[in-house]
Amino acid sequence: MTFKRSRDRFYSTRCCGCCHVRTGTIILGTWYMVVNLLMGILLTVEVTHPNVVPTVNIQYEVIGNYYASERMAENACVLFAISLLMFTISAMMVYGAIAHRVGWLIPFFCYQLFDFVVSCLVAISSLTYLPRIKDYLDQLPDFPYKDDLLSLDSSCLLFIVLVFFALFIILKAYLINCVWNCYKYISNRNLPEIAVYPAFEAPPQYVLPTYEMAVKMPEKEPSPSYIPA
């Protein structure tokens, strides 16, 4: 008697070529937790002690466009809610990976799919700006390394932007695949094992004949009648 899984494995258990997908998922969730925790602390300090954080012109990206804001406190409620939500679903994924609970990985996986779709739409829509990318950068006064980028050749700058978008999309797809493989690994691990008995052949004398063979078989002689003594 042997045991085998009731479902074959069609996923990889390696992440980044150096660790298990479960470990990689825990590291990814922990990273998101730390980033959003720091963001929540920064927003809390900005709201409770507005004089501590200096007033600066902050630019943040929302669906490919930059919007200027004089103070982060104006959008602190929305940003804090987003940070709290991201921290929660990241903590759920870490707990699910540690405790082997597949259901706890689904919220973060759905967020990854939504983020990937939005990123693809942003990348596709940004292709319309590529021929006029220098004009677009010239309208952003505080864009980092603006002068260095404007000094580059247009074709070279276009190539850099395309490579950046491609690597960005590939990275997001790889992280989605990592979480999905972890989901499949935990699901397969929680499946019950099925006992499989080896097949054996019955001896010929115990095998019933087919209908054709039974018809061709000669009839047996009837048993002698019973004669009382």
Curated annotation (Swiss-Prot):
It is a multi-pass membrane protein. It comes from the Eukaryota. InterPro entries: LAPTM4/5, LAPTM_4A/5, LAPTM_transporter. GO terms for cellular component: endomembrane system; lysosomal membrane. Keywords: Membrane, Transmembrane, Transmembrane helix, Transport. The chain crosses the membrane at residues 25-45, 78-98, 104-124, 156-176. It is found in: Endomembrane system. The C-terminal domain is necessary for retention within intracellular membranes. Belongs to the LAPTM4/LAPTM5 transporter family. May function in the transport of nucleosides and/or nucleoside derivatives between the cytosol and the lumen of an intracellular membrane-bound compartment. This is Lysosomal-associated transmembrane protein 4A. It comes from Gallus gallus.
